[in-house]
A protein has these predicted regions:
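Macromolecular interaction modules
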Residues: 1-229
Length: 229
């Protein structure tokens, strides 16, 4: 998939099995429509982990970086609905990264996704970003793959945690994020093992600590979908 806009919110968390049914109902029928009604939100997608029975990944694609500090978004973060207030404590181990999209290749929405969380070695940021852009551009063109992207976390300065953050507890954040999507899960996996392996990225300038997640698409929504409801 090609990411829509210039910024994103990327989130990883877990939900216990006994909460997953209500979580899916709330997230699909209330929370996503609410978020897609905020000016500047272009698309939301929810992904279910294929390796962790409790894991989720959610991506919000935003028109531009300033949406992260817009009144429309902050008003929602500080006034959660009763259902959101009930569900937020069940977001366990939240990693929430507010990002700039620095490279995005491909098109469409596919069913398989790999996420790689990494950090650059000090002084090698420029070289690593350039190398990743080359690799991701090439990967997005390969049969079985559909999109390849690089996001850099750039957390806006906020005076205080939002109400939603206070309900959840302290969120973590990733640093650099690679997203690789495809319509063939085996091809996505082979690319992660070969072109995006820890040893390959370390040689290009990444630190040797990376976290890889593997997901399948569960739900996606755009503002146009909300308008049609």
């Amino acid at each position: 998939m090609a990411l829509l806009g210039k910024a994103a919110v990327a989130m990883w968390w877990s939900v216990r099995p006994e909460q997953r049914s209500e979580f899916g109902d709330w997230h699909s029928h209330e929370h996503f429509p609410e978020r897609m009604s905020i000016p500047g939100f272009r698309r939301g997608s929810r992904w279910t982990s294929t390796t962790d029975a409790e894991g989720f990944f959610v991506l919000y694609e935003l028109e531009h970086y300033d949406v992260l500090t817009s009144k429309g978004y902050l008003d929602r973060l500080n006034a959660p609905t009763p259902w959101s207030t009930k569900m937020m404590p069940h977001h366990l181990g939240m990693i929430r990264s507010q990002c700039r999209i620095v490279a995005s290749f491909g098109g469409g929405v596919a069913t398989s996704l790999a996420t790689i969380r990494l950090s650059p070695e000090a002084g090698r940021e420029t070289a690593l970003q350039a190398r990743l852009s080359e690799v991701l551009d090439a990967l997005a063109r390969q049969p079985g793959l559909s999109g390849a992207h690089l996001l850099l976390t750039d957390t806006p300065r906020m005076s205080a945690p939002t109400t939603e953050q206070q309900i959840r507890g302290k969120d973590g954040a990733a640093d650099w994020i690679v997203l690789l999507s495809g319509y063939d899960a085996d091809v996505v996996e082979r690319a992660v093992i070969a072109q995006l392996a820890s040893s390959v990225l370390h040689a290009a300038g990444a630190q040797n600590r990376m976290t890889v997640g593997r997901y399948r698409l569960a739900f996606t929504m755009t503002p146009q979908d909300v308008a049609a409801i």
